[in-house]
């Protein structure tokens, strides 16, 4: 959000004319702030609460996440469904073509990874301390439901795309419920990007540290234009298509 403000106020580049705003997981809050839904102060406050709530939902070291590379969502869903009596795992992120993240308790993830190995599906444990975006985050959902209800949400100045549904959000009345649901829900990033492309978007601008989302978007559709803004030099190079 800070970089967004710098681009807009100091460099006079009007990113507010973007057709859509979207963010991945925690980044969805930055998208809301950039679209004028939340104030910067409220965004910082609720993210601090969110972080503590999610970390406290599962004892440290008891849960985790596994990234799966080179497989498709249908295959992973099938593996989880076929083994539901042996372990319980959840698709947490549908990031792009060939990149899926699964959450669960450590013991269940180990069993799941054995199945992946048997099918020669590449996977790697992520260095995280909790199983985000699954029903194991229920305690965090309860906390966030109460805290989000206290916030004032303005009507979005731009169309937002929800992590939970992968679809457009047209008014603030839906936003609070979707943000609460986001805690336990799959991040439908691939679906979100495809929606925007199908609505005519041909250029994406990633604002924030790193270029992870840029890479994901390119894997979803190599024909779209993708730019990442991480610092002042990137801002000077930005070229927004009319």
Language-model segments: residues:
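Acyltransferase/transacylase module recognition
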Residues: 1-18, 149-242
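FabD-like malonyl-/acyl-CoA
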Residues: 1-78, 126, 203-233
